[in-house]
């Protein structure tokens, strides 16, 4: 009889809370029907998809790699945590190297290469927000000193030279004095990015011998196209992904209210029926065995991923372990289902398993990696580091 009374009170509590939910279904409150997909779930599988496999080309070297390493260290700490004061302005940056280059016959003191950059606009979850070309405006070689610039083969393309010390109005850029950067966002977005299939950005890299060197015959011998120019593409989350994160935060607020309401119902039921076999933490063992977060570190070398992940070297995913007590603590933010499941296990049917200790909140992680085609990618992956635990 006491058990039936407890369950009856709990069911009435659920009904009352659902009525409160209906009243809250007004502007300013996220609809629970839209909260099915939680975008903060761990994305380690998304990271694994980036693995280039054995067909990966040679490990990048030289200035492009140094550029991306400096960009990474400005945007993330040594553990891969995105810095709060980062100025990169994007969740993902891809360094694209030329897929082909053609040396043109010299015209007087001018020496020209054409560089082709492949563009794949299949980033469904991301939108292109910025595109720049970084190139060497000075070439100091043995017996040669050249001044260089780039031109696009895109009609009516507007470009904007960026100061060597900046990458935008107030964003520092990891550039040396011999390199400069131009903004070609308009060219890419308006002329090339929305085309079906693959597009190619073609640039002319033009260098002029300085006075006094014209008599010597200049050749591009020993210089790769990546030594003179590369393309940077900046991406951000689409509106749908941002909206999904806002909805997820609203879901957490609702879950906290639900858990608090149901836990009060449990205590009220037990106080009314004092002779009932109420759930108690006294039988749940040591407090040290309760569900909690445990630190853990692993290197990408141990995972076999160090041949394509440049930085960081270590990964601290953490893990959740412990007993989900019969009365779930409020601080665990357990959902209604876990609270009811725990009560059913204790009071009604022991064959129903108790909730499991699993991660609840996650932190993102910034990773610098090499793609199959040799491009270098900086990307912030959501849900990589467990920050807290819950019972579900």
From Swiss-Prot:
Residues 1-25 form the signal peptide. Residues 26-267 form a propeptide. GO terms for molecular function: cytokine activity; growth factor activity. It is found in: Secreted. SMART domains: TGFB (SM00204). Glycans are attached at residues 85, 213, 236, 349, 373. Its main location: secreted. Disulfide bonds join 291-357, 320-389, 324-391. InterPro entries: Cystine-knot_cytokine, TGF-b_C, TGF-beta-rel, TGFb_CS. SUPFAM superfamilies: Cystine-knot cytokines. Ovary specific. PROSITE patterns: TGF_BETA_1, TGF_BETA_2. Belongs to the TGF-beta family. PANTHER family: BONE MORPHOGENETIC PROTEIN 15, TGF-BETA FAMILY. May be involved in follicular development. Oocyte-specific growth/differentiation factor that stimulates folliculogenesis and granulosa cell (GC) growth. Homodimer. But, in contrast to other members of this family, cannot be disulfide-linked. This is Bone morphogenetic protein 15.
């Amino acid at each position: 009889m006491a058990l039936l009374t407890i369950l009856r009170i709990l069911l009435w509590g659920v009904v009352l809370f659902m009525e409160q939910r209906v009243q809250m279904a007004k502007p300013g409150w996220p609809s629970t029907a839209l909260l099915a997909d939680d975008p903060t779930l761990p994305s380690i599988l998304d990271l694994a998809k980036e693995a280039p496999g054995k067909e990966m080309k040679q490990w990048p070297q030289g200035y492009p790699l140094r550029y991306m390493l400096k960009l990474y260290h400005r945007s993330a700490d040594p553990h891969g945590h995105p810095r709060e004061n980062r100025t990169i302005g994007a969740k993902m940056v891809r360094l694209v190297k030329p897929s082909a280059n053609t040396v043109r016959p010299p015209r007087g003191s001018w020496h020209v290469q054409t560089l082709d950059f492949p563009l794949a606009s299949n980033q469904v979850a991301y939108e292109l927000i910025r595109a720049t070309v970084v190139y060497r405006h000075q070439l100091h070689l043995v017996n040669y000193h050249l001044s260089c610039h780039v031109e696009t083969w895109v009609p009516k393309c507007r470009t904007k030279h960026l100061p060597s010390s900046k990458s935008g109005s107030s964003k520092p850029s990891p550039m040396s004095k011999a390199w400069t950067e131009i903004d070609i966002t308009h060219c890419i977005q308006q002329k090339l990015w929305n085309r079906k299939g693959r597009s190619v950005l073609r640039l002319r890299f033009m260098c002029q011998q300085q006075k006094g060197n014209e008599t010597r015959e200049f050749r591009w011998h020993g210089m790769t196209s990546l030594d003179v120019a590369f393309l940077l593409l900046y991406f951000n989350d689409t509106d749908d992904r941002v909206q999904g994160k806002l909805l997820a935060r609203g879901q957490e607020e609702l879950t906290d209210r639900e858990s608090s309401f149901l836990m009060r119902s449990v205590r009220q039921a037990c106080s009314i029926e004092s002779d009932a076999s109420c759930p108690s933490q006294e039988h749940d063992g040591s407090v040290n065995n309760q569900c909690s977060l445990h630190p853990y570190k692993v290197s990408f070398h141990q995972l076999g991923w160090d041949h394509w992940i440049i930085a960081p070297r270590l990964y601290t995913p953490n893990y959740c372990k412990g007993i989900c007590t019969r009365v779930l603590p409020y601080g665990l933010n357990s959902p209604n289902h876990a609270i009811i499941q725990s009560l059913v296990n204790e009071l009604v049917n022991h064959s129903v398993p108790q909730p499991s200790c699993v991660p609840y909140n996650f932190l993102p992680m910034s990773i610098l990696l090499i793609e199959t085609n040799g491009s270098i990618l900086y990307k912030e992956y959501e849900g990589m580091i467990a920050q807290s635990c819950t019972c579900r």
